[in-house]
C-alpha cells in the first residue's frame, strides 16, 4: 500500500515539480461507512468515519491567472495547466476536473479567487476502491483555496460545494455523506448523520479489542459509469408511487411497517426491493448507533451482516468479489460482522475483527478470495482520524 507522506517529503516533491517552495501543505482523509449504505440520497441516516488514508496537497499562490495541477498518482499526465477564467469540465483534464469544479462553485458562491496557484497532490487511497478519493480531493481543494485566498468559509458550505461538484460538474448523483464525513471527521469518532436535516453526532468509536479491517477487492469501480444513478432513479420513482397515498419526500421518512403496508403502491418488483433496502437500512443504522453507544459490539456486528445481505439481495450492488470477501469473512473466528462499504460494484468491504485474530483472518480470507476470483485482495487496518486540515 502507498505510504504516508511527511510534510518534508511533500515540500520536497512540490519543489521538484514546480521549482519553487510551497506556501502550505494539507491533508484530506478518505472515509469508510460503518453502516447506512445507499441511504444518504434517500433521506436516511449514515454512520461514516474519516480515516488516515487520504490525499496530501501542497500549494503555492501565483501572480498570474493560471492554475497548474500535478498528481504523483498520475505522473504520466504531467502538469496540467488551466486558465482560472475557464473552469469547465473537460474529459481530457482527467482528475483535475474535481478541483476545477470546486473552484468554479466557490467563485459562483461569491468567494474571490483572483490568482492562480500551483497544486501538488498525492493520494494513498487506492484508486477506485470506494473510499472516497474524489470527495477527499474536493475537500482538499476547498481548504487549499480557503487558506491561500483567506476565504471566510463555513466547513458545512465547503461540504455542500463538494457535493455540488460531484452532482453538477462531474455528473454523479451522489448524496452528501462522503464530503460530510471527510470535512467534519474527528479523531476516534464516527459521524452519525441525518442526511435529511444534516443534524449529526460525533460518536466515540470504542471498539474494545477489535479493529475495523478494510478489505479491498482490487476490482476498480467507476462510480460515474456504474448503476449508481440507476439505483437512485429507481428509489425516486418508488417515492413518486408511494406519494399517491403518503405525504413523504424521501424513503428515509418511512419505517418497516409503512413499507410493508404500502408496498402494493410500488408497481415493479425491483423498485420494491430497492425501497425496502433504503427503509430497512435506515432502521438498521438507527439501531447500530444505539448499540455502539451502549458498547454492544455483537449487535453492531449482526446489523453489519444484515446490511450486506440487503445490499446483496434487495439493492443488488455487491457482485462476486464483494460477496466472496464478506461471506468468507463471516466464516472466520473473531469476526463480529462484515459488509461492503461505499457504493458497491467492486471497491471495498469492512470487517469488525478481534485484534489477535487479524493475521489469521487476512491469510484465510485472502487465500479463499484468490482461489475464487483469481487475484489477491488487499487489507488495511482503518485508523479513524480527523477531517481535512492544514499540515503546516
From Swiss-Prot:
<feature type="binding site">
    <location>
        <position position="166"/>
    </location>
    <ligand>
        <name>Mg(2+)</name>
    </ligand>
</feature>
<dbReference type="InterPro" id="IPR006204">
    <property type="entry name" value="GHMP_kinase_N_dom"/>
</dbReference>
<dbReference type="InterPro" id="IPR013750">
    <property type="entry name" value="GHMP_kinase_C_dom"/>
</dbReference>
<dbReference type="InterPro" id="IPR000705">
    <property type="entry name" value="Galactokinase"/>
</dbReference>
<dbReference type="GO" id="GO:0005829">
    <property type="term" value="C:cytosol"/>
</dbReference>
<comment type="function">
    <text>Catalyzes the transfer of the gamma-phosphate of ATP to D-galactose to form alpha-D-galactose-1-phosphate (Gal-1-P).</text>
</comment>
<dbReference type="InterPro" id="IPR020568">
    <property type="entry name" value="Ribosomal_Su5_D2-typ_SF"/>
</dbReference>
<dbReference type="Pfam" id="PF00288">
    <property type="entry name" value="GHMP_kinases_N"/>
</dbReference>
<comment type="pathway">
    <text>Carbohydrate metabolism; galactose metabolism.</text>
</comment>
<feature type="site" description="Transition state stabilizer">
    <location>
        <position position="31"/>
    </location>
</feature>
<dbReference type="GO" id="GO:0004335">
    <property type="term" value="F:galactokinase activity"/>
</dbReference>
<keyword id="KW-0299">Galactose metabolism</keyword>
<feature type="active site" description="Proton acceptor">
    <location>
        <position position="178"/>
    </location>
</feature>
<keyword id="KW-0808">Transferase</keyword>
<keyword id="KW-0418">Kinase</keyword>
<dbReference type="Pfam" id="PF08544">
    <property type="entry name" value="GHMP_kinases_C"/>
</dbReference>
<keyword id="KW-0479">Metal-binding</keyword>
<dbReference type="InterPro" id="IPR006203">
    <property type="entry name" value="GHMP_knse_ATP-bd_CS"/>
</dbReference>
<feature type="binding site">
    <location>
        <position position="228"/>
    </location>
    <ligand>
        <name>substrate</name>
    </ligand>
</feature>
<dbReference type="InterPro" id="IPR014721">
    <property type="entry name" value="Ribsml_uS5_D2-typ_fold_subgr"/>
</dbReference>
<dbReference type="InterPro" id="IPR022963">
    <property type="entry name" value="Galactokinase_bac"/>
</dbReference>
<dbReference type="GO" id="GO:0006012">
    <property type="term" value="P:galactose metabolic process"/>
</dbReference>
<dbReference type="InterPro" id="IPR036554">
    <property type="entry name" value="GHMP_kinase_C_sf"/>
</dbReference>
<keyword id="KW-0119">Carbohydrate metabolism</keyword>
<feature type="binding site">
    <location>
        <begin position="128"/>
        <end position="134"/>
    </location>
    <ligand>
        <name>ATP</name>
    </ligand>
</feature>
<dbReference type="GO" id="GO:0000287">
    <property type="term" value="F:magnesium ion binding"/>
</dbReference>
<feature type="binding site">
    <location>
        <position position="71"/>
    </location>
    <ligand>
        <name>ATP</name>
    </ligand>
</feature>
<keyword id="KW-0547">Nucleotide-binding</keyword>
<keyword id="KW-0067">ATP-binding</keyword>
<keyword id="KW-0963">Cytoplasm</keyword>
<feature type="binding site">
    <location>
        <position position="134"/>
    </location>
    <ligand>
        <name>Mg(2+)</name>
    </ligand>
</feature>
<dbReference type="InterPro" id="IPR019741">
    <property type="entry name" value="Galactokinase_CS"/>
</dbReference>
<keyword id="KW-0460">Magnesium</keyword>
<dbReference type="Pfam" id="PF10509">
    <property type="entry name" value="GalKase_gal_bdg"/>
</dbReference>
<feature type="binding site">
    <location>
        <begin position="37"/>
        <end position="40"/>
    </location>
    <ligand>
        <name>substrate</name>
    </ligand>
</feature>
<protein>
    <recommendedName>
        <fullName>Galactokinase</fullName>
        <ecNumber>2.7.1.6</ecNumber>
    </recommendedName>
</protein>
<comment type="similarity">
    <text>Belongs to the GHMP kinase family. GalK subfamily.</text>
</comment>
<dbReference type="InterPro" id="IPR006206">
    <property type="entry name" value="Mevalonate/galactokinase"/>
</dbReference>
<dbReference type="InterPro" id="IPR019539">
    <property type="entry name" value="GalKase_N"/>
</dbReference>
<dbReference type="GO" id="GO:0005524">
    <property type="term" value="F:ATP binding"/>
</dbReference>
